[in-house]
Design a protein with these regions (language model features):
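Generic surface-pattern signal
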Residues: 11, 18, 185, 210-214
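Nucleotide-sugar donor-binding and catalytic loop/hinge architecture
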Residues: 38-48, 207-225
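Non-catalytic N-terminal targeting/anchoring module and adjacent flexible stem/linker
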Residues: 1-51, 68, 72
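Generic low-polarity alpha-helical segments
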Residues: 1-5, 12, 70, 174, ...
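Short, structured coil/loop segments at alpha-helix boundaries
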Residues: 3-6, 86-87, 96, 202, ...
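Active-site and donor-binding regions of nucleotide-sugar-utilizing enzymes
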Residues: 51-206
Length: 225
């Protein structure tokens, strides 16, 4: 355990005590009770292989392709942390007992991440370690994987250093891989594992389009963009 880092984290927690927007009542609030139960339940599980973290329900779509593949091709249990109490993952979990969802608000998430114990943590949130969300102080061999939101340039859309503390990045294509490699050379950063895995959202759009009925129009249309 990195005790110096833990001591520093106490100061950081005090400095960001108002994080998370509107304040909730701590006593008698059903979300507070639910959060405490899920926090305790998460740490009661040993040997967690894969943990996903989602900021809200809308981010599930970036993980969907990976999660569905793991469920279909492995026996891995998916531990899914979300800061959205209405996240669709809770409904999905009712039909698949290998999905274990947990509601953890933004404040309690800080300490949960500091105490994280898992083989792999998958996130779509940049700036790991740069701000309030840290790598685990308990376990140093966790592999942190970053999943991009889109297919565009990471250099043009991300802050400098926003991926420096991830171990792996699932790149949507060759252009993202080359950008990261050149950034690592320019700033003398440790090399990450860069996986060219594509973009599952585009795959799903193509499948949906193939299912649609198509009829060619005799009148040509011009799209100006």
């Amino acid at each position: 355990v990195d005790y110096e880092a833990l001591e520093q984290s106490k100061k950081e927690l005090q400095a960001i005590g108002n994080l998370g927007g509107a304040q909730r009542k701590r006593f008698g609030d059903p979300l507070t009770k639910r959060e405490k139960q899920d926090y305790k339940k998460f740490f009661s599980v040993v040997n967690k292989h894969v943990v996903f973290y989602s900021e809200s329900s809308g981010f599930y779509k970036y993980f969907q392709g990976i999660i569905e593949y793991l469920l279909e091709n492995t026996n891995i249990v998916i531990h899914y942390i979300t800061s959205d109490p209405e996240d669709k993952i809770f409904e999905l979990a009712t039909s698949n007992d290998r999905i274990r969802p947990y509601y953890i608000g933004e404040k309690r998430l800080i300490t949960l991440m500091m105490k994280m114990d898992a083989d792999v943590v998958v996130m779509t949130m940049p700036d790991l370690e740069n701000y309030h969300i840290k790598r685990s102080y308990i376990r140093k061999d966790i592999e942190y994987i970053y999943i991009p939101h889109g297919m565009d340039s990471l250099n043009l859309t991300m802050r400098t250093g926003s991926m420096d503390h991830y171990d792996s990045v699932f790149c949507v294509g060759k252009h993202q891989k080359e950008e990261i490699e050149k950034t690592e050379v320019a700033y003398q950063l440790p090399k990450k594992k860069l996986v060219e895995w594509g973009y599952s959202l585009l795959d799903e759009m193509r499948v949906d389009y193939a299912k649609m009925s198509h009829q060619n129009s005799e009148v040509k249309k011009i799209l100006i963009a």
